Amino acid sequence: SDVYKRQNMRANAHIWEGDNAAYVNATRMGGYAPHLGLVLREGEIKSYEISERDRNKGNSHTRGIISLNLPDMKLMPGDEQVFSWYIFSHKGGDDFRQKLLERESVWVSCNKYVFEKGETALVKISGGQMVKDCILKKNDVTIPMKKQGTAWYAEVVMDQLGEVRFDILYGAGKKTHANCLVISNVNDLIKKRVEFIVANQQMKSSNTRRDAYMVYDNEKNEIYLNNTHNCNPVDRDEGAERVGMGVLLAKYYQLHPVAEVKASLLRYASFLRNRLQDADYKTFSSVDQKGRNRAYNYVWVADFYFQMYKITNDKQYAKHGYMTLRSMFKQFGHGFYAIGIPVCLGLQTLKNADMQREYQELENDYIAVGDTFLKNGLNYPASEVNYEQAIVAPSVMFLLQLYMETGRQKYLDGAKIQMPVLEAFNGKQPSYHLNEIAVRHWDGYWFGKREMWGDTFPHYWSTLSGAAFYLYSQCTGDHSYKERAENIVRNNLCLFFEDGKASCAYIYPNKVNGVKGGFYDPYANDQDWALVYYLLVQNGIY
């Protein structure tokens, strides 16, 4: 079957363009060993690029051709430059690391990759006898490293905002690096983002889209009205993924009850109900109420309504959330892998609102979904993308929450079976762009101003894996998954800037189809879901 092929005959390639210590960890999509590793033996890799990507060449479904780039060099007559590598099988995780070290490479790690100003980074390099007299350079400032067993480490105060590149010199003329980011303060960053949305991304003109949260063009410093030619207008409209801005503001208000935020939310709630839904709660993403009827949109709107109940205690919002989900289940059944179905939030809201009949009906719907997910197991149906992390993570998130609400062991067992498949999307490279960030490679095209294909490291939906890991930790008591969840949501903070602006995706490869990458897309579009899940993982706000 296609699912079998994807999980057994395809791999998630985790690439580290780490100079003399470059590697590729090709992890089988199904999580089943053996996997394939490539580690550089001689030479240097500076970056990688993607080619053969467009709507007619794999569309969103394949990653393209990956090319590892050599450094620029000038060879005189008679000169030579040798590049060689090892290819080996491995069992995943620690076994990959061990086999890399056995082949005389090194492993670099940091205690974390995004720091608040003033925090201390612990940078560590592990290797064999070849690793000696290590020197660390922080943005070209030299810092001594200390030896500890077969590893070397340095503690560095992160005192300057922005990206910090740690270059590590080791062995005979060899080097590698790690990339970290320093931000001012997480709470301030989120506060500035919320204030920016209220001030700049809510429609104020008196047309039919008034009070909607909209895409913002960071280059033009204005709302993008979705009125110029683009590849997919439904990914830039006034509904759908943009509802994440409303969910973020509602969660933020629960921590910081600011009057302006509540006023903005009340206007937005009215816009959603009166402009994007009909009397029967059929949900659209544009005010003309035409275009695709998309199951994803119902879940996000319902999530928003349930959050609104929490901040107003107005039973009407509990009803709106319930009716929106009922509309989805009536139209789409119980087999769709929607992103972010509010299991705990929805049921607890209906319980708190004393809506016992509705609680029972919604629980029955959720059990029907959960039983479908259990039956399917690892045989995920294709969605808007044939196979991706945002099919697997929502399944795990749903089953874990259903276990929390019902106490039925089968749902936890079903989630456990899917965890290796979810974890296979993540790599361990020493960069805030890459470490535990799920492989995704199409969102920059569909949602960005540059309409650029290629690896998005990070893309905000990578925080779904963070949410799944957090919930798994809550259900099992395994704290290591909580730490991994925190790392994922923290690394996604790079999509938010000190002035309150944001970016929907970072295009990571050096080039895609020959066009320069390595940039944050200029549209603030749908990335605020990253902060929604940050507040789940760090503050426990469902």
Annotate the PLM regions.
Residues 119-129:
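Aromatic/hydrophobic beta-strand junction motif of beta-rich domains
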Residues 94-121, 368, 372, 395-542:
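Terminal, non-catalytic domain-edge segments
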Residues 14, 23-114:
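Beta-strand-rich recognition/accessory modules
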Residues 77-78, 115-120, 161:
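Solvent-exposed, conformationally flexible loop/turn segments
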Residues 186-463, 488:
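Catalytic cores of extracellular degradative/oxidative enzymes
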Residues 3-4:
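Short, small-residue-biased leader/transition segments that mark boundaries at the very start
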Residues 97-119, 176-217:
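Low-complexity, Pro/Ser/Thr- and charge-rich linker/hinge segments at domain boundaries
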Residues 129-191:
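Extended acidic/polar, glycine-enriched regions
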